[in-house]
Amino acid sequence: MYVLMCPCIQDPGLRARGITRESDLRAFEKALRRCRECGLDVVFLPCPETLFLGRDREPGTFLERLNTGDFFHLLDRLERDVKDIIRARGPPLCIVGVNSSPACGVDTTYYGDDGKGPARRAGRGVFLARFPTIPAVDVTDFCRYRIYLAAPLFSAAERRYNAHLRDILTAHFFLVFLPQEAGDDSSHRDEESQQAIFSRCCREIAESDIIVAVIDGADADSGTSWEMGYAYARGIPVVALRTDFRRAGMHEHVNLMLEQSSRVVRNEEELLQALKAPSVLRAGKLEVK
């Protein structure tokens, strides 16, 4: 399996002058690390802006710098080159793009002021728009792949379901920390063991990108609730999975403090969508001509 990736993620010097922040560089590095750690090959796309305007260029919108016949001819050639890659290798898992880019934006692009909308508007950049049936993910979403799976683990059924969830997430190229596989699976623990488990779990939460919490039952597990609160206090997003059809009230799926501090989903498909797993974002069949 492979991804098509914007080349500036590997070489930020391809970007316009002065737009790259430290947070961008961290996201770029983590996106590349995800591919290495999850066994994804990377095929880098060409950079239309650099090929057309050169390096060390001033920032500009599509309408300001790229809206010319010569640029569209360049896009035609690059599109053919990319489709040759797809024909040889098969469809990619996704394209990893960079939001706001005039050419390679995913959710937003600097199109320019045409009197019909804001200069920065929703939609793909002009190059990624040439591949509408390939799912595209912004690098700041793709780089969030380390998951802490918070869930009750006291019964065999709970542990089996936790392992089932871990396997699903791993199959979608996430790295998952499962506390029951790190020693937190027994009631026979001395004080030293308890402290070691607590410290390990706190550290793993702090190093995670997202918490996935299982909150089934008449009342959510107390340990899971604490892990959710700890993550929320640290600014780590929490996605809460509640497959239980019982509700806490007329307007609440579960305790409001848990619901307001997380995104609650009802099944595994919604969980993968909330995590922006590339394989569930497919829009249709890719036609390579």
Each language-model region and where it sits:
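Short connector loops at secondary-structure junctions
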Residues: L40-P59, D141-F142, F177-D185
